[in-house]
Amino acid sequence: MLRRGHLAFRDVAIEFPQEEWKCLDPAQRTLYREVMVENYRNLVFLGICLPDLSVISMLEQRRDPRNLQSEVKIANNPGGRECIKGVNAESSSKLGSNAGNKSLKNQLGLTFQLHLSELQLFQAERNISGCKHVEKPINNSLVSPLQKIYSSVKSHILNKYRNDFDDSPFLPQEQKAQIREKPCECNEHGKAFRVSSRLANNQVIHTADNPYKCNECDKVFSNSSNLVQHQRIHTGEKPYKCHECGKLFNRISLLARHQRIHTGEKPYKCHECGKVFTQNSHLANHHRIHTGEKPYKCNECGKVFNRNAHLARHQKIHSGEKPYKCKECGKAFSGGSGLTAHLVIHTGEKLYKCNKCGKVFNRNAHLTRHQRIHTGEKPYECKECGKVFRHKFCLTNHHRMHTGEQPYKCNECGKAFRDCSGLTAHLLIHTGEKPYKCKECAKVFRHRLSLSNHQRFHTGEKPYRCDECGKDFTRNSNLANHHRIHTGEKPYKCSECHKVFSHNSHLARHRQIHTGEKSYKCNECGKVFSHKLYLKKHERIHTGEKPYRCHECGKDFTRNSNLANHHRIHTGEKPYR
């Protein structure tokens, strides 16, 4: 950080050794000139004067800019006018061999050494010809037009070194306030910029003067340096190389940002929580967490976001754009993260591993969601009833119970559902598809949960245990039904006779007594049944299926009750007295 004292121009200038300057191509020299021009513009309005025009004539002969230096002097007149004096050609030509380069200290306490390679451009802008002494009025009534044009540039210099100027005894208090509060502002629409060069580029947009045009795509730019950077997109040129890892970049600013990965430097600190960041843009995004600001609004639906990237991602929902395509199967995605996660399907790679149980996942979000099983964390709470959930989508689906919202509608029959999974499961009824197949017995199922429950018949797994009596169950729903035996709860009531039941299936079975309905028909013999369970048991007569096997002797049975009766032969149990 530069503090009060002398600031040499070399501290802000771009320096090239003699041999490197000769290696620069015309485009690179043009870029160098434009950067130096911007710096000179900033210095002029801090009180730095211009040299004699005879020195400029030397530049017209394309002399090496590295060998041209000049000393400029400033003098204040009592009448409130500032006289700018140049030096003659003879003294200027001798400066290249002088060892002592004198510097100028202006009223802000800064000293600068001028490089003259770009001063010809300044003279053209000021329309000065044939004079060695130019007077510039500094009183309010006689402000020069050039000073008006570049007032924003002066603000940039003051803003850039605000820490040096804030405590400077030479700077008026009102000017300090301007430094702190008013960055460069556009006179057309009032938009503010932190950097004067961006303001200048913005003003070129208003004048429709974009003189630099790309021959590849016809895009126009306000200055040649932007055009040079843009053309690297077409050429693929990446001239800036990281010496640590060899990675290449097309902009030096990107290289500087990348190098912080190796150095670990995080110069941007949040004053609210102390968190540090490698990029200023990351700090700005983070700061909105504290302020709650969401400046990016979707024009389609009005939804607001705290990051422009989030808005861009959201807008693809409306446009249907899916620019990220898998080269393996052709599937397209709206976001790069979606494609990255999808590619794992082809590679089989699972990068994220749970330290508790060793289970691996192909997405970090899935691992985070899984780890809540071990921690028991349920961070999402319903404001209506206080119920908590492990996942946000579960809370969203639950909340629709209170609102009655059913946004997912079947196009075949018009039935609506609270969540997408309910609609997806329902659609299989119309298609007849049963995509989930048991590897043990080849039985197929419409839902993955049904397959998981079925597979426990083969494994014997009963993960759900009753805390009251210790009985185990293969399904959580069976445990919930069983638990009502202990509580005596019977939440299902018949509207005809007001009889109550502990199970919804028992109520459905009971209702058929009133309706006389037998809606389940055997396709083999035409026999009808009032319950689906009865039909399934009956169908085993035709298929010969015996899914219940005794582990003691290997005998098979068509019904679970028959297996239970048989098992008593081995145990010797005689429950009926």
UniProtKB/Swiss-Prot annotation:
SUPFAM superfamilies with a match to the protein in the record: beta-beta-alpha zinc fingers, KRAB domain (Kruppel-associated box)
CDD domains: KRAB_A-box (cd07765)
Signal peptide: none
Listed GO MF terms: DNA-binding transcription factor activity, RNA polymerase II-specific; RNA polymerase II cis-regulatory region sequence-specific DNA binding; zinc ion binding
Cellular component, GO annotation: nucleus
Protein name: Zinc finger protein 880
This protein's record includes keyword Metal-binding: yes
Pfam families in the cross-refs: KRAB (PF01352), zf-C2H2 (PF00096)
Keyword Electron transport found: no
Classification via SMART domains: KRAB, ZnF_C2H2
PANTHER family for this protein: C2H2-TYPE DOMAIN-CONTAINING PROTEIN-RELATED, KRUEPPEL-LIKE TRANSCRIPTION FACTOR
KRAB domain ranges (all copies): 7-78
Zinc finger (C2H2-type): 184-206, 212-234, 240-262, 268-290, 296-318, 324-346, 352-374, 380-402, 408-430, 436-458, 464-486, 492-514, 520-542, 548-570
Keywords (A to Z) from UniProt: Metal-binding, Repeat, Zinc, Zinc-finger
A biological process term (GO) from this entry: regulation of transcription by RNA polymerase II
Organism: Homo sapiens (Human)
Gene: ZNF880
